[in-house]
Amino acid sequence: ILLLLIASAPSVDAQLKTKDDVPLASFHANVKRTLQKLLNKRCCQIVPQCCEWN
């Protein structure tokens, strides 16, 4: 019975984490934020009206 419980337990590998133990959701949020900043900088150079002033 103990072997069945161990086999059915969630695996550590099933958790969404990078090799540095950072949750992937946080990693994706950081990437999205960085890309948005780059897009805003590019947009500001072309069309100043689309700049975000945060």
Swiss-Prot record:
It comes from the Eukaryota. One of its GO terms (molecular function) is toxin activity. The modification 4-carboxyglutamate is found at E52. GO terms for cellular component: extracellular region. Its main location: secreted. Residues 1-14 form the signal peptide. Expressed by the venom duct. It is found in: Secreted. The keyword Secreted applies. Pfam families: Chi-conotoxin (PF16981). Residues 15-40 form a propeptide. Contains 2 disulfide bonds that can be either 'C1-C3, C2-C4' or 'C1-C4, C2-C3', since these disulfide connectivities have been observed for conotoxins with cysteine framework V (for examples, see AC P0DQQ7 and AC P81755). Keywords: Cleavage on pair of basic residues, Disulfide bond, Gamma-carboxyglutamic acid, Secreted, Signal, Toxin. The cysteine framework is V (CC-CC). Belongs to the conotoxin T superfamily. This is Conotoxin mr5.4b. It comes from Conus marmoreus (Marble cone). The lineage of its organism: Eukaryota, Metazoa, Spiralia, Lophotrochozoa, Mollusca.
